[in-house]
């Protein structure tokens, strides 16, 4: 059987479209399930933004496999209810609350100090909390909501916990201690420069809140790569991921017309529920495959697939962002000068 050139081109284009949709939405058949999570007894995990959505499912499944799990968030009353839900489902669960307000650098610092006072080890850190497309507003620290919540505060929190992570890694096999950054394919919405160093707040950018969200997610991915390079000698793995397009509260700030379009169109069938949405996070946090295949610094897409970054970046740019961000917190006296 022979095909015309146009017919072959159509097939290639169709395949590309299907693969892109699978990468964006996570509609591929999972090669990995919750049953593949190894026993985590004796391990300590921390999940930010775990009161609902994929953060809740991530914390629940880590607890189900025996880990002691810290739920990090702002509203203690809300989290007490979440902890009860987890206890009701997993009777043997070891769940703790850690107060963390990502809109306040001082709260981030205090949260890290509180955790360090309670625990000597940390095996799994999942930087999951996020905010998407809110109206333009600055935090008390002077940063736009998305860049602070999604990137800056997670950067500070992670850097403060690095001594604990390194100490934990001394007694573990390479790759058993992991930092997971829940990013998004929306990193493609970042400004042309990727990161706008003159003003991270992007107050006048043409695409507004979407570009600000994209920049915050791109920064997360680049930070993950920077950490992977810095921490490999300690046996600590840092990875990032796009969890898929998920039905969660994250979209609460999205334009009403956009949500209605999703709900009333074929795109509603492309949305993942939080259970499937959490699969990639849990794969990144626990799968032995990642250590076995030396996937430190990797970027994953839904569901539990190795992804490809579609924006060019080099080591110099990654390092520039790392040092630029570190300097912010050096000046605020939250971090010591970077070596």
Swiss-Prot record:
Keywords: NADP, Oxidoreductase. It is an enzyme of class 1 (oxidoreductase). The active site is at residues 213, 217. GO terms for molecular function: oxidoreductase activity. The keyword NADP applies. InterPro entries: NAD(P)-bd_dom_sf, SDR_fam. Its EC number is 1.-.-.-. The keyword Coiled coil does not apply. It comes from the Eukaryota. NADP(+) binds at residues 54, 78, 101, 128, 213, 217. Belongs to the short-chain dehydrogenases/reductases (SDR) family. This is Uncharacterized oxidoreductase C736.13. It comes from Schizosaccharomyces pombe (strain 972 / ATCC 24843).
């Amino acid at each position: 059987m022979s095909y015309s050139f146009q017919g072959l081109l159509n097939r290639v284009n169709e395949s590309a479209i299907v693969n892109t949709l699978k990468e964006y939405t996570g509609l591929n058949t999972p090669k990995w399930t919750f049953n593949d999570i190894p026993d985590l007894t004796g391990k300590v995990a921390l999940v930010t933004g775990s009161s609902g959505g994929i953060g809740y499912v991530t914390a629940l499944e880590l607890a189900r496999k025996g880990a002691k799990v810290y739920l990090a968030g702002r509203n203690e009353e809300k989290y007490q209810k979440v902890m009860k839900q987890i206890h009701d489902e997993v009777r043997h669960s070891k769940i703790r609350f850690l107060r963390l307000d990502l809109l306040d650098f001082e709260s981030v610092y205090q949260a890290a100090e509180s955790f360090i006072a309670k625990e000597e080890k940390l095996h799994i850190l999942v930087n999951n909390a996020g905010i998407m497309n809110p109206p333009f507003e600055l935090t008390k620290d002077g940063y736009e909501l998305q860049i602070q919540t999604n990137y800056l505060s997670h950067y500070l929190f992670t850097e403060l916990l690095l001594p604990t992570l390194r100490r934990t890694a001394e007694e573990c096999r390479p790759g058993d201690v992991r930092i997971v950054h829940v990013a998004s394919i929306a990193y493609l919405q970042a400004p042309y420069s990727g990161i706008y160093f003159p003003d991270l707040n992007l107050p006048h950018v043409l695409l507004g809140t979407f570009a600000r969200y994209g920049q915050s997610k791109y920064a997360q991915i680049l930070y993950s790569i920077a950490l992977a390079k810095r921490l490999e000698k300690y046996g600590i793995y840092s990875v990032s991921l796009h969890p898929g397009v998920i039905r969660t509260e994250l979209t609460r700030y999205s334009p009403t017309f956009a949500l209605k379009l999703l709900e009333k169109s074929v795109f509603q069938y492309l949305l993942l529920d939080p259970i499937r949405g959490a699969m990639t996070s849990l794969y990144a946090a626990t799968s032995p495959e990642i250590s076995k295949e030396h996937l430190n610094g990797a970027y994953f897409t839904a569901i539990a697939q190795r992804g490809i970054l579609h924006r060019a970046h080099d080591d110099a740019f990654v390092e520039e962002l790392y040092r630029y961000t570190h300097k912010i917190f050096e000046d605020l006296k939250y971090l010591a000068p970077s070596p």
